């Protein structure tokens, strides 16, 4: 099911940055193991979040609603080297899943997860 015209979707695909391998793995595992995988930010939204973060180059980021951590990892891409990302989620059952992917990334020590 397409929510935007197929030609527009094709254009976005052709002109978007490649999705990092870690995020591809996170997407795959989210769809395999987690309820409501459509809540995942996804490739294109993630690249937009990454681009905005790189433009702003924040020292601190607060994210409310972590889900499986996709958007947090995208936002972390533009964070200053000494920066911190604090992400808060109500679902404590996802903590281990989120932490696993944060720790696989180069931002693991900078991402602080609260439930």
Locate predicted features:
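S-adenosylmethionine/decaboxylated-SAM
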Residues: 43-115
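Conserved SAM-binding loop and adjacent beta-strand
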Residues: 17-18, 34-47
